[in-house]
Regions:
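Mid-domain alpha/beta scaffold segments of enzyme catalytic cores
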Residues: 2-288
């Protein structure tokens, strides 16, 4: 009897009759828009970030919505630099509350570690919490600052009647990159933004059977290299989850990815790989 007759078959040997197949790597994601400084995350922030990591979310971009929240976002990034980056900016509902201090303060904040974009900035004519003329002034000043600092811009556009597109068109040549986050616009608006080489952020709005139908039809039209995913947590919890969690959080991003992949007719792993690469490129995260 040959000496090695009773040796067990080694599954990883080239001559093994039953080679072990490596399990596919689980999808990895980047959530480009989370309001982690919101008070609803105050009591369990570490657990929220931990659940996101366990769900395959490798990086969270914390949204800055005013100067105080931008400072808080920077502080969070200092606590969890391996998981968090942030934007600094003033979003349209509070545009009337800022004055001459805005640009010097934002310029200083943008120099902090972890800051990867200017925003959230833009226009919101749906709620009109600030006068529209003041919204446009504050948006224009932040676009100019982003151009000066050569940082990408994280844009809010809600019912702006084409004014966001018009202002982006005016400034686009000087801007390095633009994402219109939580896109909920029309096909014509999508076409105009793509013509300006903008990225498009898709949230759990696409999972909402009551109001997400038009967006669901547009998702396949977004070029693969322009697509980014976000939860916009704690809002916009995906309604496709049953039971529906009481609060959205970045650990639920894979559900948005699942729905988007289905709409685009691609594998979830393919979508995760592509949108993660897009986010790393957009926010200059290649050093992670």
């Amino acid at each position: 009897m040959p000496a090695d007759r009773d040796d067990p078959v080694q599954p990883n040997r080239p001559d093994s009759p039953c080679p072990v197949q490596s399990a596919p790597a689980p999808p990895r994601w980047i959530d480009i828009g989370v309001n982690l400084t919101d008070r609803r995350f105050a009591l369990d922030l570490a657990a929220v970030v931990g659940r996101a990591s366990a769900a395959g979310v490798d990086r969270i971009i914390v949204t800055g919505t005013d100067l105080a929240h931008s400072r808080a976002a920077i502080a969070l990034c200092a606590r969890m630099p391996g998981m968090l980056s942030c934007c600094v900016g003033v979003h349209p509902p509070v545009a009337a509350a800022v004055g001459d201090e805005l640009l010097p303060e934002l310029r200083m904040l943008a120099g902090n570690p972890g800051v990867c974009a200017i925003g959230e900035t833009g226009l919101d004519y749906d709620r009109d919490h600030s006068p529209r003329a003041r919204q446009r002034e504050v948006f224009a000043s932040q676009l100019a600052l982003a151009a000066e600092l050569q940082l990408p811009v994280f844009v809010h556009d809600r019912a702006s009647a084409g004014d966001v597109v018009a202002m982006l068109r005016e400034h686009r040549a000087a801007l390095v990159d633009v994402v219109v986050h939580c896109f909920t616009g029309t096909g014509a608006e999508l076409e105009a933004l793509l013509a300006l080489d903008c990225h498009i952020g898709i949230t759990g709005w696409v999972c909402d059977e009551r109001r997400g139908g038009e967006l669901a039809g547009l998702v396949p039209q977004i070029p693969a290299d322009r697509l980014l995913l976000e939860t916009d947590a704690p809002w916009l919890t995906p309604r496709t989850l049953k039971p529906r969690p009481p609060r959205n959080e970045p650990a639920l991003l894979p559900e948005i990815g699942r729905v988007v992949a289905g709409l685009r007719g691609c594998a979830v792993t393919e979508l995760a790989s592509r949108t993660t690469a897009n986010a790393r490129r957009f926010f200059r995260l290649d050093g992670d």
